[in-house]
């Protein structure tokens, strides 16, 4: 039986990585590389590297700068930055706001779910994806 996370990962194709890093030792880089290898179209977001490339993908300054539709916004930023990211996700009309391990934002959960956006927190997309490959 599929759960919500499995369904989200199975039906999504585009993922914006907020807090993307070009440092191969950072979790955001490792997760981004894994997801890209699994066939997802990745959109790295990091205002320090905008207009450069990470893993061959153009880096964007903000979610709104991406011209494509985004299925998942995957957040690698501190919890206190999530509300602003959630508001960008709502404006972009994304399907899911996903907060990585140790990132929690009850306020963001309330505002995105009130807009019909899926909300996942304190879970790693790579770890969750690997669970469904068994």
Where are these regions (language model features)?
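NAD(P)-binding Rossmann-fold cofactor-contacting core
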Residues: 23-26, 32-53
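Mobile, glycine- and charge-enriched loop segments
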Residues: 31, 55, 60-78, 115, ...
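A short helix->loop->beta-strand "cap" motif at the edges of active sites that frequently abuts
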Residues: 38-40, 92-97, 115-117
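Mid-chain, well-packed structural core segment of small domains
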Residues: 63-103
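Rossmann-fold NAD(P)-binding glycine/threonine-rich loop
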Residues: 101-129, 133
């Amino acid at each position: 039986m599929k759960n919500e996370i499995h369904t989200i990962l199975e039906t999504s194709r585009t993922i914006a990585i907020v807090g993307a890093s070009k440092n191969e030792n950072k979790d955001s880089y490792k997760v981004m590389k894994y997801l890209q290898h699994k066939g997802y179209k990745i959109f790295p977001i990091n205002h320090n590297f905008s207009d450069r490339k990470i893993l061959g993908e153009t880096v964007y300054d903000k979610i709104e700068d991406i011209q494509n539709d985004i299925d998942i916004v995957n957040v690698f930023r501190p919890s206190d930055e999530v509300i602003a990211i959630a508001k960008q996700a709502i404006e972009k009309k994304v399907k899911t706001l996903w907060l990585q391990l140790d990132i929690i934002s009850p306020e963001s959960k309330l505002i995105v779910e009130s807009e019909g956006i899926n909300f996942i927190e304190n879970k790693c997309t790579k770890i969750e994806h690997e669970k469904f490959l068994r």
